[in-house]
Regions:
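Membrane-proximal helix-turn-helix segments that form the acceptor-binding/catalytic region
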Residues: 194-202
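Single conserved hydrophobic/aromatic residue that forms the stacking wall/gate
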Residues: 209-217
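Short loop-to-beta-strand entry elements in the cores of soluble alpha/beta enzymes
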Residues: 201-210
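Short functional linear segments
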Residues: 10-61, 68, 74-79, 86, ...
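Conserved beta-strand/loop subsegment of P-loop NTPase cores
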Residues: 174-175
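Phosphate-coordinating loops and pocket residues in cytosolic domains that bind phosphorylated ligands
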Residues: 27, 187, 195
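Short, basic, low-complexity termini and linkers enriched in Ser/Thr/Gly/Pro
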Residues: 1-12
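ATP-dependent carboxylate-amine ligase catalytic core
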Residues: 37, 41-52, 78-168, 180, ...
């Protein structure tokens, strides 16, 4: 009975810590969208620059980038690679955003990572505003380093050039179909939008553009 009670108390404490972490993370949404890499780079510096120690595939575009990321992760996993996958937004649970070999990050791990990162960020003198996506991107990269993934697949949140995920120096950049979206942030023309999304293409890095096939009616 004592053992069972202890497990129940421990589970409740973990759930409370996880909820506190979510409250902190979602509280960052009050800062809205802040484009640029300055804050996420500062956060990564404070936590040891984990992105420099993992191999990444970076996927941007307008349509299909999430499904492309998921398919690539599945294929690579079947080939024997240990694969980290970072996508957004989530459908029902925050933990859907960060996976290793198809398994979502545990709630307890989210709580532990959040608290550890907060302490390191505060010690480094980094103060808000930084965004929910800045923090969660850094969290995903740290988690992938800790779990010693062979490859990490990162889906761009919005745009590309100034997106928080663009801190990585990837093995491969992929851009899916490009159409008009988020014109207030990315530009009013398809050319400007494409230019922002193409910002994930790095010098001396392989890239590919996946175009949707048009069918006649």
């Amino acid at each position: 009975v004592k053992g069972r009670r202890s497990r129940v108390i421990h589970s409740a404490m973990n759930q409370n810590s996880y909820q506190q972490s979510l409250d902190y993370l979602y509280g960052l949404e009050k800062f809205g969208m802040i484009f640029g890499l300055t804050k996420v780079e500062a956060i990564l510096e404070a936590i040891g620059n984990p992105h420099r120690e993992i191999q990444a595939i970076h996927i941007g575009g307008t349509n299909g980038k999430g499904s492309t990321a998921a398919m690539m992760a599945s294929i690579l996993q079947k080939e024997g690679y240990r694969v980290g996958l970072y996508t957004s937004p989530h459908l029902t649970r925050f933990t859907e955003r960060i996976k290793v070999n198809g398994k979502e990050v545990e709630k307890e791990e989210v709580a532990t990572l959040t608290e550890w990162m907060k302490k390191r960020i505060e010690a480094a003198g980094i103060t808000p505003p930084f965004t929910f996506f800045d923090f969660t991107t850094a969290m995903a990269l740290l988690y992938f380093k800790q779990r010693m993934v062979d490859l990490s697949i990162l889906e761009v949140g919005l745009g590309g050039r100034l997106d928080s995920t663009n801190v990585v120096d990837p093995l491969l950049s992929i851009i899916t179909n490009i159409t008009r979206d988020h014109e207030e942030q990315l530009g009013k023309s398809i050319l400007k939008i494409a230019g922002e999304k193409a910002g994930i293409i790095k010098k001396a890095v392989s890239y590919t553009h996946l175009r949707a096939h048009e069918t006649g009616r």
